[in-house]
């Protein structure tokens, strides 16, 4: 069905076609029908498009709004009749159907070119955690993008794709190897980590006009014995979590005065530096500290560590050893272990749903309930990627939304209410797939890349103001945002 005419025609015909009484509701006040709008009789042949036309007619919208429809918390992907049959529901029942705005297609906004692979990205905006924690005001148009690269440098970009600031080289207090993770802690502080085994804190400052700035070394944190794969920050408690290939989770303070001394055996040895390096470093003195704790329980590299969104004294970690572990950060003790069937490569918390999303080496995302009362390990599986899922971020607009970045060269948007049932149980399907703009520009958008060769996505961030920001092997930051369909 491709328009609403079927509804009109059928509604006026004799009762030759099955009908069902539906109650249309919405939790979004600006699109809700009046409270006194009772159930209406509609043909069971209606699908999403015709239902959307019906709701727009009932609302009296001059400009139609695309809607999605949910029955019992699941998106309607068939006709009403097929849904009733599949779920054993009588057409005599009054069916409650919730409608929501359809997701806006994420269009390409901009790409920022780098000299090397881009491993990590973060956003500073009025709605980003760093600004929210600090109660800072970021004016529209003054948002910043942070990137961490395999060339060992941090860069801060403005929305006009100009570099505002670059971190110093290794000789001047910068990273001595590739950066794997970078986050804004506050609007004036950045945390980064990478293959040089250090977590580093930086003071970020801008000129008054905002077109230039500096990233100055502030604190070096030593404790890991192998590369660091990811970071999580929590500015209100001045805490950082790091995930390392040495099988441990690092727990750190962002404040020099709170942190213990750095382990002597892990500090850069003066003997290992060339005379030229010593000379260059002589003007750069950066305080060095150690971890508050190293959480050791995993038996393989730790890929991700995050804070519980509702309780920063709780941490979660995911590892190549197939396990998800829950930590009490006050006592530095292991609380719970959930073992899955595959290596876990990324992690995100969906707090309102009491779920953790974990990206796997087996190309899917598993949703895990970490609560002790949970009877099953995996609550749902999200399938669609064709290579490892290495980055995850929540949808800032929706409790049910998630985005994933994969080595297959795509980012996929998920709404966990968009499901189907197959031999593996309830399986989620992606709502949109975002490809790399670099392929399109090369005229190779239809070219099948084995495993995402050349365009692997390494990091994705979803900001309410800026949009979806992803980074990857194509040496680019890419920004996509839902524009051009709805103004609201």
From Swiss-Prot:
Record InterPro entries: G-protein_beta_WD-40_rep (IPR020472), NLE (IPR012972), WD40/YVTN_repeat-like_dom_sf (IPR015943), WD40_repeat_CS (IPR019775), WD40_repeat_dom_sf (IPR036322), WD40_rpt (IPR001680), WDR12/Ytm1 (IPR028599)
Signal peptide: none
Compartments in which it is found: Nucleus, Nucleolus; Nucleus, Nucleoplasm
Main subcellular location of this protein, as a coarse class: nucleus
Gene Ontology terms, MF aspect: ribonucleoprotein complex binding
Region listing for Ubiquitin-like (UBL) domain, in residue ranges: 20-101
CDD domains in the cross-refs: WD40 (cd00200)
Alphabetic keyword roster: Nucleus, Repeat, Ribosome biogenesis, rRNA processing, WD repeat
WD repeats: 128-167, 174-212, 223-262, 297-337, 339-378, 384-424, 452-488
Region called Disordered, residue ranges: 256-285
A Gene Ontology cellular-component term: preribosome, large subunit precursor
Family label: Belongs to the WD repeat WDR12/YTM1 family.
Quaternary structure note: Component of the NOP7 complex, composed of erb1, nop7 and ytm1. The complex is held together by erb1, which interacts with nop7 via its N-terminal domain and with ytm1 via a high-affinity interaction between the seven-bladed beta-propeller domains of the 2 proteins. The NOP7 complex associates with the 66S pre-ribosome. Interacts (via UBL domain) with mdn1 (via VWFA/MIDAS domain).
Record function comment: Component of the NOP7 complex, which is required for maturation of the 25S and 5.8S ribosomal RNAs and formation of the 60S ribosome.
Protein name (record): Ribosome biogenesis protein ytm1
Native source organism of the sequence: Neosartorya fischeri (strain ATCC 1020 / DSM 3700 / CBS 544.65 / FGSC A1164 / JCM 1740 / NRRL 181 / WB 181) (Aspergillus fischerianus)
